[in-house]
Amino acid sequence: SFDRPNIRYTVVAKDDSRRQLLAFLEEHRGQAGIVYCLSRRKVDATAAMLAERGVRALPYHAGLDADVRSEHQRRFLREDGVVMVATIA
């Protein structure tokens, strides 16, 4: 069903993407979410930057080992407040 009241999709014009992302995540501290990036490299860099700032962020893309992807997906589904950083593909 498309009726998913627990999911919110937001599009915001990009100005200073890093600052905007950090501010958004701070407003929603402790909540789960997905951040989409255009490349695997950007996924890895964004997940690392967020983790350095205390966000429970995990990368997720086809370039990761299948076991790592599976573990990150499991954590996202079972743990509170995990932010998945993924490619759009």
Tell me the role of every PLM-derived stretch.
Residues 1-89:
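Helicase motor core with emphasis on the C-terminal RecA-like subdomain
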